Each structure stands twice: as structure tokens, then as C-alpha cells.
């Protein structure tokens, strides 16, 4: 079918594009001030040109449940068609379902999503020729968009496709539960609510649903399970009913939160211990990739299960790229992105990770006891230090240069992503965020005293390079 007429979008070409929307792993901004139909149209044309240059003729387009998704989708699709692309419009889906389409229907795709950002945000996550694009590739798109350096071509067209049935069948055909489980699922009014509860029921679970209605106003709580305040309703439902476990999803369904019957939040680095043990039972010696924010307890757990632990840079695109290089069967980030290559496609998917978790825990009579028994330490939540634009990377370079003269044995210095210093009883991390102008701090100690000592040592170093540093809780 032909694309809808978009003459109104063409009039927007005089509007300058805000450089702030081009992030390390995606394009993201506030609607309509920095992200609007004009930007979406230009992105469609620029991405379409890059796709054709890579030999990609077909691009899937999906969108989450945000209020601005429909208008941005229309403009993006028009831009892709202008570039000569065949667009497969898969409608309102989770980000992992867009990735699924880009693995099964074609090799490239764009998801319109604001992820876990406030409701007036939206953005674009992109896959080109089977790879999540990031960094320089996003900057190349920016250059094409700013210069309007595209060629309009004929031959573009749009068709609709529904991937839901194929996606559900693929998961239900892969995951088998040893027994039915009773769970509570909190989708936070994000797009996962449209599919995740039904998938869990298809696996044999008894599901109590919280906030499954897709509503871009997010009227109940923000869809970000990495923040404890967003898990209160889930914990209350668990403790007032007879469910065994609670699962929570972020706004676009690519991250998973887990809560035990007694209200304990099982953070992603501890989830990875369980997933690694399971995956390595079938892929002995496999490389398990995780980011620098993860617990010091994770590497020994991977080694004990017969795997090779590999610490890498934070960023879902970076973790996926590293996994592809080494054929790693599993990867994970402290932010909640879990990447299964074993039995799956290697992309981050909160629903699929939840299903794999249930498969493991269905073998136990007391799932909460299994989760609570995973090794843990005393740790801080993610902390932020606000900086000027461009300052965080400069500061981390200074910290990396100073560290060898400040920290001595038995401290081990790691500079793969900022500065991480490991002691026998804990670690400290200071790194530059790739998405906002802040330093990201995280500390862990085997005891409260160790945590306190490590925090003080790392903060003392930070104050040498940024005397006005104010450490606060992370905000998204």
C-alpha cells in the first residue's frame, strides 16, 4: 500500500535539529520540542539511505505505547518510503518484538520508544543489517539529517504485519516449566502489558496482573523496575496474595525486575548468577559478558559454574557487539538488560528473560529461597554527579591517570569503562554516562565497614578532580 501523504512534514525542514537528541545508543528527546515529526521524517530518509548502502531493502518499524508514537511512526515510515525502502509496519509492540521482526522478517528495524524516560520523551532504537547501531553510526545519521544529504528514490512501499503470534509461539515452544507457578506481573502501563501476561499463562502460570492496560500517561507509577519506589505495588500484591514471585517490566519491555515473596528486589547482577549457572550447564566453558556496574560476586559465580567471566563496558549495544564477537551464550547489564544467545537471538528481552527465570525456578518448591540464597553484598544504588556537557569523559580520563599513584596492592585498577577499583572486600566505580552529562558512581562492600571505606576513598579521589562534586541518587 502507498505511504500516507506527508506534505505537512516537509514544511518542517527549516526547523534545526537539536544535537542533544543523538545519544550513544539511540536517538532520544522531548516531544515536540526536540523530537517531532520533522525529525522522524528526516531520520527515515537518512536511515533508509544507509540501509540501501548496506544492501538492506526492507526495514521493520514498531512503536511502544507512548502518546506520540503514532504521529512519529507515520513520519518515520514516510521518510523510509521516500528513500526507496519497503517498510514492514508491525504496529504497537515491545522493543524485543521489533528485534524479533528484525531477526525473522528482515534484518533491519527501528523501534519508536522512550523506554523508561518520562512520558513526554520518545526516541528511536535502531538495528541495521542485524546489528544495533550506536556511536559513530548514529553521528553519521545526524550528519545526513542536518545536511539533508539524502537521495529521494522511488520504489518505497509499506505493508502491515503482525509478529505477535510468531513471537509467542517461538517462546512457548522453547520454554518448559516443571510445574505451574503463581506470579504477579506489573507492566507499569507499558507496552509489555499487551503480551507478557498472556505468554506467562500460555506457559501454564496463574497470573495476577497489575497495570497491564497500555497507557502512555503512566498513571500508576513510572515504568522503571530498576527504581525500588516503582516496585511498591508489586510487593504489596505479593504479600497480600498467594503468588510465589513478582515480575516487573520497563516501558518498552526490554528490561526485567524480579521481586521475591518476602519483598526482596533481586538485582540483575544476581539474576545473572542464576541464568549463568543454567546456561553453562548446557554450554560448558562459555563466555558470560556483564558490565562494569555488576557485583564483584558475579565473576566467582560464573567460574564456579564452569564459565569464563568477561567484564565489559556498559551499554546494551556494546554488550551485544561483544557477545557477537566471541559467540557468548549470555550477557547482562546492571540496568536490567539480559541477553540470551543460547536458545534465543542474543537481544535483550524482559519477557523472554522472565520466562527463562520461571523455567529455572519451577524446578524448586520455594523460588524465593533460591533467589535469596544467591550471593550478595552491601551496595549503594546507582549514584550520579551532575556535570557540564562534555565534562564527564574529561574527568574520568583524569581519574584514570591519577589512580595508579593513589591505589596500591591489593587494589586492582580497571579502566575499560571509567575507573573501577576492586579490593578483596568490595569495589568502587566512577564512569561517565553515555546518555546524560553525569558521572555514574556505584560502590559495594562485603561488609558495611568495607562499603564505607571504599566510598570514602573513591570520593576523595573524585574531589581532587572535581572539588564541587555533589553526589546524589540517580534520576532518569
Which stretches of residues belong to each language-model region?
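Cysteine-centered motifs
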Residues: 5-6
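Proline/glycine-rich low-complexity loops and linkers
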Residues: 90, 140-169, 173, 261-334, ...
Amino acid at each position: 500500500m502507498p505511504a500516507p501523504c506527508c506534505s505537512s512534514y516537509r514544511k518542517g525542514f527549516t526547523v534545526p535539529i537539536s544535537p542533544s537528541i543523538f545519544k550513544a545508543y539511540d536517538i532520544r528527546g522531548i516531544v515536540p520540542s526536540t523530537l517531532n515529526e520533522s525529525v522522524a521524517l528526516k531520520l527515515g530518509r537518512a536511515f533508509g539511505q544507509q540501509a540501501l548502502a548496506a544492501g538492506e531493502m526492507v526495514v521493520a518499524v514498531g512503536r511502544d505505547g507512548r502518546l506520540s508514537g503514532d504521529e512519529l511512526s507515520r513520519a518515520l515510515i514516510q521518510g523510509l518510503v521516500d528513500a526507496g525502502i519497503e517498510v514492514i509496519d508491525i504496529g504497537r509492540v515491545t522493543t524485543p518484538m521489533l528485534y524479533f521482526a528484525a531477526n525473522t522478517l528482515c534484518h533491519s528495524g527501528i523501534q519508536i520508544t522512550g523506554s523508561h524516560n518520562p512520558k513526554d520523551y520518545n526516541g528511536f532504537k535502531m538495528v541495521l543489517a542485524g546489528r544495533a547501531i550506536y556511536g559513530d553510526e548514529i553521528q553519521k545519521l545526524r550528519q545526513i539529517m542536518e545536511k539533508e544529504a539524502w537521495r529521494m528514490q522511488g520504489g518505497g512501499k509499506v505493508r502491515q504485519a503482525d509478529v505477535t503470534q510468531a513471537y509467542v509461539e517461538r517462546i512457548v515452544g522453547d520454554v518448559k516449566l516443571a510445574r505451574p507457578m503463581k506470579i504477579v506481573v506489573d507492566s507499569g502501563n507499558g507496552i509489555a502489558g499487551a503480551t507478557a501476561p498472556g505468554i506467562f499463562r500460555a506457559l501454564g502460570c496463574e497470573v495476577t496482573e497489575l497495570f497491564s492496560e497500555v497507557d502512555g500517561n503512566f498513571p500508576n507509577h513510572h515504568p522503571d523496575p530498576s527504581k525500588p519506589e516503582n516496585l511498591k505495588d508489586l510487593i504489596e500484591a505479593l504479600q497480600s496474595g498467594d503468588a510465589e514471585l513478582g515480575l516487573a517490566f520497563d516501558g518498552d519491555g526490554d528490561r526485567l525486575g524480579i521481586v521475591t515473596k518476602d519483598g526482596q528486589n533481586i538485582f540483575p547482577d544476581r539474576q545473572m548468577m542464576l541464568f549463568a549457572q543454567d546456561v553453562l550447564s548446557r554450554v560448558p566453558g562459555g563466555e558470560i559478558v556483564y558490565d562494569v556496574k555488576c557485583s564483584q560476586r558475579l565473576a566467582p559465580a560464573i567460574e564456579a559454574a564452569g564459565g569464563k567471566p568477561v567484564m565489559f563496558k556498559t551499554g546494551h549495544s556494546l554488550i551485544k557487539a561483544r557477545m557477537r564477537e566471541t559467540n557468548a551464550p549470555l550477557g547482562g547489564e546492571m540496568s536490567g538488560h539480559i541477553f540470551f544467545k543460547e536458545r534465543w537471538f542474543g537481544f535483550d528481552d524482559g519477557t523472554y528473560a522472565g520466562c527463562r527465570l520461571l523455567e529455572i525456578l519451577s524446578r524448586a518448591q520455594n523460588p524465593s529461597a533460591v533467589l535469596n540464597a544467591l550471593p550478595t553484598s552491601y551496595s549503594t544504588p546507582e549514584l550520579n554527579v551532575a556535570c557540564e556537557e562534555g565534562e564527564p569523559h574529561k574527568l574520568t580520563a583524569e581519574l584514570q591517570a591519577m589512580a595508579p599513584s593513589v591505589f596500591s596492592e591489593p587494589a586492582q585498577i580497571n579502566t575499560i569503562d571509567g575507573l573501577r577499583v576492586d579490593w578483596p572486600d568490595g569495589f568502587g566505580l566512577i564512569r561517565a554516562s553515555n546518555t546524560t552529562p553525569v558521572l555514574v558512581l556505584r560502590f559495594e562492600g562485603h561488609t558495611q565497614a568495607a562499603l564505607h571505606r571504599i566510598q570514602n576513598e573513591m570520593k576523595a579521589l573524585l574531589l581532587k578532580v572535581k572539588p564541587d562534586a555533589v553526589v546524589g541518587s540517580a534520576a532518569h
